[in-house]
Each structure stands twice: as structure tokens, then as C-alpha cells.
Regions:
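Gram-negative bacterial Sec-dependent N-terminal signal peptides
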Residues: 2-45
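Boundary of Sec targeting at the N-terminus
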Residues: 45-52
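Gram-negative and organellar
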Residues: 51, 57, 62, 76, ...
Length: 842
């Protein structure tokens, strides 16, 4: 995500931050204070010299910052002699030094409005009005001082500062510029103008003036101090720290810590920017976090004085933790701040929202992204930051399965980004990179909503317009994989590899494609490489998870149970179950497996119990899957040996061919087994899979029964999607089968020839989905015809309902209840059965 400024500009604290007039004690003030001190309660024998010594001591202490003794003495004097104006003036001046504007105004109020103040007292009064935000009164006093004391520049400077503080920054800048034009070598004038520029939000102009002032008076600490603060406001805290470090004591402890926090915040802003090498990508964030660990205890030690800066440090530290991908700590610190009643600024909420999203708490993330967009990133603000927040909000909606608002967000984001933008200094409009980012997210949003056709169309158009953009090619490859075209995805990724061979998203997608293509060694290499380089990345972790699941053992269980039927063909109480256990991969390409099965049924001639066991090996490499097994079968009269071989070969992404042959096939009808008849089968198929929405299977399967009957079956089955929504899919299913037998006098159902035509519709509705966990229900309904030689044609009807549950990539279970009505030998028979399956990896 794009980084942004983590803290608003910090405004100096008026006169305490801008001491352009050094504290001097004019001759009039010295005389006045001496007179005041001489009138204080002292022993009768005390000489005037003693009063002078007392005065000198009090003044020295006041000038050193210990104002209270002098103020106490002056208060006592005024209590004894309320009309002593000289004491009142002195009290106003020293109270101004002490930063007590209320006492200055109180003392002046006791004098009356008609009195004409001396220059220093008038300056103290003007500053007091300014400190109390009484702008008009302050300006009036400063302008009075300019008229009465034209030689005193502090009144001119004070007017500039007051104009700046009152929000009249343009007037302040104009007045400051006029003063600088009159006195270009006056460092105080340039500092005042710099202050006005800061309030006018022109930090670089302010830095220029402060730099000029520093050149004019490098020996003055007050000038250097304001130069340091100008650097701070211009976003150059490291330079400010370097200059401040050259003069120990230049800044107060609090100001020094504040400047150090600015420097760390600058590091945070750079923390997730691209780095020269992958190994360095966390270096800046680690340095920033280490500095926070040093500074925050110091701020806590300051007590209430440091509370504001401590809160700022904790808020800015959220961004450093985010850049370091320590997302749990981001959330914990945010919740701690909220529990303490701290209002976290809106600009910091995007990092917290991203952390919640990383931790799979999209509902919390949604709320924070929405708040950040409304409060920190309005449409007329920072467009890059706004798009980043909109993208985060989209993913929050999508991962919370709220697709309508997710679509609204990406549409709004795309609408706000023009294709071209004008850049200052460029004669022609420039391509807007943010438009491309928004368009890519919009295209990928269609993939997230299962609208793969639209996603493919959009991304292919973008790739045609920007063929050298590897990110677009990687995104397009992801769509191709979702469309069940792994080879096409692989080709697209090869083109992207030529552009950015070490790109992490590229290698992750190549890893997924390698798993789809059964390129196990390549998948492991890509997984190992990306995991070593980016162990914290969620996409890398997803690839790692899929690789780990692939390397687990696998248990498959399938079964059926007749619930109610009046069919003599399938038997009453029919039940069957088979379980197969596959080992983890052996030397990448091999898996051993073993399984057992059982089937039973009741017929007119009696019950039959069929048991079998099998063991074998599976070989899987690119484009080819082979299986071979030996088996034993028991259905009365002892065990009998059997075997099976199968092969599947992928010609390309769409076409697949395969064949299998079995001795003593487990597909032999139970009624035939009851009579000791078994079947050897051969099956050849061709599969055409246009995409994930369309698949057709053409099968020819001859069988030879041990009673001399030869059966030939051929069929076409197909699935064609005709409606897609995020939580609802509708498919048309087609079953078209024909068979022919050489005998019709068998004890099992064996029509001379028949034809089955059964189109049906399947609706799949997602009841619940949360990342790798999904719960679906299916509705199935179909109507067709069954034609049997010698018995005519009759209607077929099918209705079904099922549910499926998947979780954690390793557990998948489903069950479907179906009811069928169809003719057998001209007689209509009905059956209600349940079919179930389970897959578990461990």
C-alpha cells in the first residue's frame, strides 16, 4: 500500500517557540525595579546599595527563568501601593517573561485604560493579548507601539506573528515580505516571515527565509533554533537533528524528543517503499521500531508533559509495525489505544484495517477503511492514498462475502481515475498509473465474484494495451488457472518471467500452475524459493499450504444406501461402501494405495454380500496419470484374484484421453455375482473441457461377462453452466447412454439394447463461505426418456437434494438424496437412495 504522512504538521507554540527578541533589561526597567525594590519592606537601617543588590539578584534570577521571587515582590509592592505604575509596569514585563498572559492582563486592568504604557510594558501587553488569542486587541497594541516607538522593531515583528496566528496568513506574509524588503539583512525579520510562511502552509518558503536568517546570525541560538524548526516543518528532521546536535542545549528536552519522533516518522514513511535488495526491505522498519523502543520510555518518564508525544509515537509506530508485517501487534496496540480512550487519527486507520484483513477479520477491516475514506481521504484529496484505501475496502467486502458493495467500491474507484493526467511541467498529458491499478482491481474483482469470462476479457484487453506489464500477465494467468487452463497460464507466466524473472507474485503463480500440471519438483522449488524470501506474504503462505496438503496422505470414502425402492433390478436394502487410502508422495511421482469395499443387496433369489480389497501404485507426472492394482474379490465360494490398469493423458488444456481395464470389475451387477457371474471391463474415454463452465465426456465401454454375454456401452455426459453468481450456480446436465448385449436370458438385468436420455438442471447454492470453509446445497431435477428394445419407451424423472461441506483444504464431505422413477422391462420402478463421499488428507 502507498505510505502517507503519519502525523499532521506540528505548529510551534507562539512566542515561546519564536523568541526573536532576546530578553534584555532596558535602563528604564532597571531604574523602575530599583525604585520598586527600595519601597519594599526592608530594615530601616538598610542602605540603598542593599536594595540595589536585592534588585540585581531578583533580576538575574528572573532572566535565568526564576520569575516567581521578583513577581512575588512586585505583587506585595502593588498590594501596599496600588497606584505605583512603575511597579505595575515591571510586573507586566516579568509576567510576560514568565509566560503568564492572564497576570499581564490583570495588572493592566488594574491600571485603567487611559494610561499610556512604556514600550516594554506595551510589548508585554500586546504579547499577552496574542497568547490569549485576542487577535484584534493584540494587533491594536502592536500598531500603537509602531506609532509611538517607531525605532522598536519588536512591534512590527509582533504584528506579523499575530496576523499569522489569527489565520490571516496572507496578510502576515505580505507584511513580512515588506519588512524583509526594507531590511534584507535583518535576521529577526526573516524569522518572522518564515513563521508566517509556516502558518500559510508553505514550508519550503519558510525554510528559505530561516536559512537566510541563519546565514546572517549563525551565532544566535534563537535564530538557529528557528532554523531547526523550519527544517522540521519542511520534512527534513534528520538535517534538523544534525544541526541541533551541534549545539547542546539548543532545544528543550521535549522539543528534542519531538524532533526525534519526526525523524523516526520519516523512516516509517520510507519503510515499505521498494528497496535495492529483498534482504533490505525490513531494514528501515526495524531501525524505526528500535528508535521507538528507545524514545517511548523517555516520553513516559516525562509524565503528563510527554503524554501527547507518547500518543503520537504509539500511533506512528502502528505504521512501522505494519511495514514489518507484525500484524497481530498492530491490532493489539490499536485496541490498547482504543481501550485507553485514545482517538486514533483517521490517516492511521488504513494500516490497522490492513492488519485486520491480514488476520482474516474482514468485518473489522471494512469499518476502518470506510472511516479512513470518509475522514482522511476524500475524493478531492490524496488520490493515491484514496485508491489504496478503496482497494483495501474492496478486499474487505469480498472476503466478507459481500459482493454487491464490493462491486460498488471498485466501480467508484475506477470512475474516479482518469486515463490521462496532466503533470506540471509536462507539455502533454501522461498515462495515469492509478487508472491502471484501479482497472486491474476491477478486473480481478470479477474473478473473485466467479465471473471468469468478464475477468478474462478485461485482463486480455489490458495485456494487449500494456504487453510489457508483468503484473497484468500474472493476473491474467491467475484467471486462466481459474478457467482450468493451466498450460495457457504457464505460457503467460513465461512471458511475464522474461520481464521480471524474480517477481514474487510471478513465482507464486508459477508454483500453483506447476501443481496443476503435476510438475512436482518445479512446484517444490518455487515454493521453497518464495517461502525463503517472503515468509510473511499471504500469497506465499497459500502456496506453501497447497504444497503441504499435496504431500499428505489421502483417504477417500464413497458409498450409497438404498432408502426405499420397489426395484427388482437393484435389490432391496442395497448398500455399498469403499475406502481407499493413498500414501504421501514417494519420490515426487509415486503413491501407493490400498482399499477395501463392501456391497450388499436383497433379491428374490436371496441376499448377496460382496467384499473386495485392492492395493496398487499411482504414477503422476506432467500430462500423464497411471494406476495399477491387484485385488481379491469374495462374493461366495472363496476369494478370487483380479486387477486393474488405468491411464489418463492430457493432450492440452481442453482435451484428455484415457482408458482403463479391469479383471473382475467391481462394477459387476450384484445380481450377477449372486449367480457366480463376474465381468471383465474395458473403458476408453475422451474428455473435452472447454472451461470450468463446460465439460463433455465421451465413453465407450465393452464388458465380457463370464456367462458369455458381451455388453457394449457408449455414452455422452456433459455439464454446461448457464448462470453464474457469487453464491449461486446453475448447470445443465446431459446424460445420453446406449447399451447392447449379446444375451437376454441372464439372471441380471440385461436388455438386448437400450437408450437413456436424461437432461437435468443442477442449482448449487452457497450457504456459507469463509476463506477455505464452504457449505453448499444442491438441487437437482431432470426429466427424460428410457427406450428398451422390446418394451418401448417410457418417461424418466429425477429429483435430488444434497449438501457439501469443505474446510481447511483437507476435509471434503458431501451427501445427496435422489429419487428416480423409470421403467425396467416395461414396468415402472421407483428408487430413493443416498450417495455420500468423503475425502480427508492428513
Amino acid at each position: 500500500m502507498t505510505r502517507h504522512s503519519r502525523s499532521p504538521a506540528r505548529v510551534p507554540a507562539d512566542t515561546r517557540r519564536l523568541q526573536t527578541l532576546r530578553r534584555r533589561t532596558p535602563v528604564q526597567l532597571a531604574v523602575g525595579l530599583a525604585a520598586a525594590m527600595s519601597c519594599l519592606a526592608v530594615p530601616a537601617h538598610a542602605a540603598p546599595a542593599q536594595a540595589d543588590q536585592q534588585y540585581d539578584a531578583l533580576i538575574q534570577r528572573a532572566r535565568a527563568g526564576d520569575h516567581e521571587p521578583a513577581l512575588t515582590a512586585l505583587r506585595e509592592r502593588l498590594a501596599q501601593a496600588p497606584t505605583d505604575r512603575r511597579a505595575a509596569y515591571d510586573r507586566m514585563i516579568i509576567a510576560g517573561w514568565a509566560g503568564r498572559p492572564a497576570e499581564v492582563l490583570e495588572t493592566y486592568g488594574q491600571l485603567g485604560d487611559a494610561v499610556q504604557l512604556p514600550a516594554d510594558a506595551l510589548a508585554a501587553l500586546a504579547r499577552a493579548h496574542r497568547d490569549e488569542r485576542q487577535w484584534d486587541a493584540s494587533l491594536a497594541r502592536y500598531r500603537e507601539g509602531q506609532q509611538r516607538f517607531p525605532a522598536r522593531q519588536d512591534f512590527v515583528l509582533g504584528e506579523i506573528l499575530t496576523l499569522a496566528d489569527s489565520g490571516r496568513s496572507a496578510d502576515a506574509v505580505a507584511a513580512g515580505q515588506a519588512l524583509v524588503r526594507r531590511q534584507p539583512s535583518n535576521a529577526d525579520a526573516r524569522i518572522a516571515l518564515a513563521y508566517a510562511y509556516i502558518r500559510a502552509r508553505e514550508p519550503y518558503e519558510a525554510l528559505y527565509e530561516a536559512d537566510k536568517a541563519n546565514t546572517l546570525a549563525p551565532q544566535r541560538n534563537d535564530i538557529v533554533r528557528e532554523y531547526v524548526r523550519a527544517l522540521q516543518h519542511a520534512g527534513l528532521p534528520e538535517a534538523a537533528l544534525r544541526i541541533a546536535g551541534e549545539r547542546p542545549g539548543l532545544l528543550s528536552r521535549m522539543d528534542s524528543l519531538s524532533l526525534q519522533l519526526d525523524a523516526v516518522a520519516e523512516q516509517v514513511r520510507l519503510a515499505d517503499k521498494p528497496t535495492r535488495t529483498e534482504a533490505e526491505r525490513f531494514a528501515i522498519a526495524d531501525r524505526a521500531l528500535a528508535r521507538y523502543d528507545e524514545l517511548m520510555p523517555q516520553l513516559r518518564a516525562l509524565g503528563p508533559q510527554g503524554e501527547g508525544e507518547l500518543r503520537r509515537a504509539r500511533v506512528d509506530r502502528l505504521a512501522a509495525l505494519h511495514a514489518r508485517v507484525r500484524m497481530r501487534e498492530v491490532v493489539d496496540e490499536y485496541e490498547s489505544l482504543r481501550a485507553e480512550g485514545v482517538q486514533v487519527p483517521a490517516y492511521a486507520l488504513t494500516d490497522v484495517a490492513a492488519a485486520y484483513l491480514y488476520l482474516r477479520q474482514p468485518e473489522q477491516s471494512e469499518r476502518l477503511y470506510q472511516q479512513a475514506l470518509s475522514e482522511a481521504y476524500p475524493p478531492e484529496g490524496d488520490t493515491e492514498a484514496r485508491l489504496a484505501a478503496q482497494t483495501g475496502l474492496y478486499y474487505s467486502h469480498a472476503e466478507a462475502e459481500k459482493f454487491p458493495p464490493a462491486g460498488d467500491v471498485v466501480q467508484q474507484a475506477s470512475a474516479e481515475q482518469p486515463l490521462w493526467r496532466w503533470v506540471q511541467g509536462q507539455p502533454a498529458a501522461q498515462p495515469n498509473d492509478l487508472w491502471l491499478d484501479a482497472a486491474q482491481v476491477a478486473a480481478q474483482s470479477r474473478l473473485q465474484a466467479d465471473d471468469t469470462v468478464n475477468a478474462q476479457q478485461r485482463l486480455e484487453e489490458m495485456v494487449q494495451r500494456a504487453p510489457a506489464n508483468s503484473r497484468l500477465r500474472v493476473a491474467l494467468a491467475d484467471v486462466y488457472r481459474a478457467r482450468a487452463w493451466p498450460r495457457r497460464a504457464e505460457s503467460e507466466l513465461k512471458l511475464a518471467e522474461a520481464l521480471e524473472p524474480r517477481s514474487m507474485p510471478l513465482e507464486v503463480q508459477q508454483g500453483h500452475a506447476a501443481l496443476d500440471l503435476q510438475e512436482w519438483r518445479q512446484a517444490e522449488m518455487l515454493r521453497n524459493d518464495t517461502l525463503a524470501r517472503y515468509p510473511e506474504d499471504l500469497a506465499v503462505r497459500r502456496l506453501d499450504r497447497e504444497w503441504n496438503v499435496h504431500n499428505k496422505a489421502e483417504l477417500r470414502i464413497e458409498g450409497y444406501r438404498g432408502l426405499a425402492n420397489d426395484s427388482a433390478v437393484v435389490g432391496n436394502g442395497n448398500f455399498g461402501i469403499e475406502s481407499v487410502l493413498y500414501s504421501p508422495p514417494i519420490n515426487y511421482d509415486w503413491r501407493a494405495f490400498g482399499g477395501i469395499g463392501y456391497a450388499t443387496g436383497r433379491f428374490e433369489e436371496g441376499n448377496v454380500d460382496y467384499r473386495w480389497a485392492r492395493t496398487g501404485v499411482q504414477y503422476r507426472v506432467r500430462d500423464l496419470t497411471l494406476e495399477g492394482e491387484v485385488s481379491t474379490h469374495s462374493y461366495g465360494g472363496g476369494g478370487r484374484a483380479g486387477g486393474r490398469l488405468s491411464a489418463q493423458y492430457d493432450i492440452d488444456d481442453r482435451w484428455q484421453v484415457g482408458a482403463s481395464g479391469a479383471l473382475r470389475s467391481t462394477g459387476t451387477p450384484l445380481r450377477a455375482l449372486k449367480q457366480g457371474i463376474y465381468a471383465d471391463t474395458l473403458s476408453v474415454f475422451t474428455r473435452y473441457r472447454a472451461s470450468e463452465r463446460s465439460e463433455w465426456l465421451f465413453t465407450v465401454a465393452p464388458s465380457r461377462f463370464s456367462d458369455g454375454n458381451d455388453r457394449l456401452e457408449a455414452g455422452v455426459t456433459g455439464v454446461q453452466r448457464f448462470y453464474t453468481a457469487p453464491h449461486l450456480k446453475a448447470d445443465l446436465l446431459v446424460d445420453l447412454w446406449a447399451s447392447r448385449n449379446t444375451r437376454d436370458d441372464t439372471p441380471y438385468y440385461n436388455p438386448r439394447s437400450d437408450l437413456t436420455m436424461l437432461p437435468s438442471v443442477r442449482l448449487t447454492h452457497t450457504l456459507y463461505r469463509r476463506y477455505e470453509t464452504a457449505w453448499e446445497q444442491q438441487f437437482l431435477a431432470g426429466a427424460g426418456a428410457y427406450a428398451q428394445r422390446g418394451f418401448g419407451t417410457g418417461a424418466m424423472m429425477l429429483i435430488g437434494y444434497g449438501q457439501r461441506f469443505r474446510t481447511n483444504d483437507v476435509f471434503d464431505v458431501g451427501a445427496t438424496i435422489t429419487g428416480t422413477s423409470r421403467p425396467y422391462d416395461g414396468r415402472r420402478e421407483r428408487e430413493l437412495r443416498i450417495v455420500f463421499d468423503l475425502t480427508y488428507r492428513f
